[in-house]
Amino acid sequence: MTHDAAIGRLIKARTISDAWYRGLNVIWNHGSLITDERGSQIREFMNLMVVIEDPYSNEIPEDSAWNHERLEEYAKQLITGENAQDFEYTYGQRLRNWDGKVDQIEYVIEKLTNNKTTRRATAVTWVPTIDTKVDEVPCMIIDDFKIRDDTVHLTTLFRSHDFAGAYPANLYGLSKLLEYVADKVGLAPGTITTMSVSAHIYDHDWDKIEKIIKGVQ
């Protein structure tokens, strides 16, 4: 049995910038054209896995619309759970106050501190009692932390991933979250791996991304 859908690719990247450009290239050149449930045209590559060896060098792609100030604010919201702009929810709120009851980041830190080989240092953003009833739901679903060789590694699952618009900010924020957790555990931060079930580029970004892809090929 064969399938026309573009599914499955592993990218081993050195930095966040390297990951972004290489991911865009895969989606642009090998992705499928689909119309999503909101009627938007996208280029999509399913199950795109990216391993970033050094998330702390060359963090901001020069072609990204994100600047350092905006990225720092994004990272702050992710780590602290603050919602100064009164969004319907933030990832930080889901991680630090899941369903109004659980600080999952403190749970992760405790698990890692108590057992360096634990496979239970996992945080989730999906709240079924809320997210099955609304349209605006989290794209980032799971953050899983593991200690291997005295280094803390992070693996994150995105059910849906706006690779052109959001990936640089997502990874900058995740790098700061990993750094925060590793510091609390007393170890060095390591790699970040993202699994994007639907890695896509929206049609409103196509002209810009086409120029970027031509410039880096």
Curated annotation (Swiss-Prot):
Q: Which InterPro entries match?
A: Thymidate_synth/dCMP_Mease, Thymidate_synth/dCMP_Mease_dom, Thymidate_synth/dCMP_Mease_sf, Thymidylate_synthase_arc
The protein's GO terms of the molecular function aspect are:
thymidylate synthase activity
Among CDD domains, the record links this protein to:
TS_Pyrimidine_HMase
Output this protein's name: Putative thymidylate synthase
Q: Record's family?
A: Belongs to the thymidylate synthase family. Archaeal-type ThyA subfamily.
Sorted keywords for this record are: Cytoplasm, Methyltransferase, Nucleotide biosynthesis, Transferase
- UniProt xrefs under NCBIfam families: thy_syn_methano (TIGR03283)
One GO cellular component term: cytosol
Q: What is its pathway?
A: Pyrimidine metabolism; dTTP biosynthesis
Subunit description? Monomer.
Keyword NADP found: no
